[in-house]
Amino acid sequence: MPRPTPGKDWLAGHRTEAAADRILDAAEELYTQRDADSIGMNEIASVAGCSRATLYRYFENREALRTAYVHRETHRLGRAIKQQIDGVDDPRERLVASIIATLRKVRDSPALASWFSITRPPTGGELAGQSEVIAALAAAFLNSLGPDDPAVVERRARWVVRVIISLLMFPGHDEADERAMIEDFVVPIVTPDTVNSARA
C-alpha cells in the first residue's frame, strides 16, 4: 500500500480523531516489526505520512503515543469481548470466558502480542499494569458480575490485570491448562462474595 506524502494538506478532510487514529495505525504497523522501545517518533511520522510537527501536535512524546495506542486497543478488545460473552450468564463462567477471550485476542494480534514477548522489553506489561483505563474497565466488568465493596472490586481488578499480563508473558501449556488455572486460582478470589456464598 503506498504511503501518503507529508505535506500541509495531510489533515485535509480528516477530523482530529481520524488523524490520531491514522498515526496510531502507523505505529501499529511498526509494532508488528520491532519492539516498541526501539521505534522512534521519526519512523512513526514517516509511516503515517505526516511531519514531526504534526505528530507532536497529537502526541507530545513517545510515551503518550504508546499509551494512547494501548488504550485504543483496550477499548476495541473490550467491545469485542463483551459481544463474545454476551450469552454467558453465570458470573463465574463469564469471568473465565472473558479472561480466555482476552488472552486469545491479544495473542491473535501481531502488534499486541509483540508487547508481551519475553524476548523483548516488558513494555506491554508495564503499560497495562499502570494504566488507569485498563484498571477501570476491569473494575467495571467485575462490578457487572455482582455487587461488592468498591475498594475490594478495585483491588480485584488490578489483580486480574496482573494475572492476564502474567499469562501473556508466561503462557500455560495450552488453553485448557490456562482455563484450569483461572478456574482454580482466580475465580474463587475474584468473583463477588455473594456469588461464592450462593455456590457454597
Q: For each of these PLM feature ranges, what is it?
A:
Residues 23-31, 77, 81, 102:
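Short hydrophobic clusters on alpha-helical segments that form packing/core surfaces
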Residues 48-59:
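Short hydrophobic/aromatic patch on the recognition helix
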Residues 59, 69-70:
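DNA major-groove recognition helix of helix-turn-helix
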Residues 68, 82-108:
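Hydrophobic alpha-helical connector segments
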Residues 78, 97, 122-158:
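Amphipathic alpha-helical packing segments from all-alpha helical-bundle domains
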Residues 83, 115-123:
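Short linear capping/connector segments at secondary-structure termini
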Residues 104-108, 143-144, 158-177, 188-197:
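Amphipathic C-terminal alpha-helical segment
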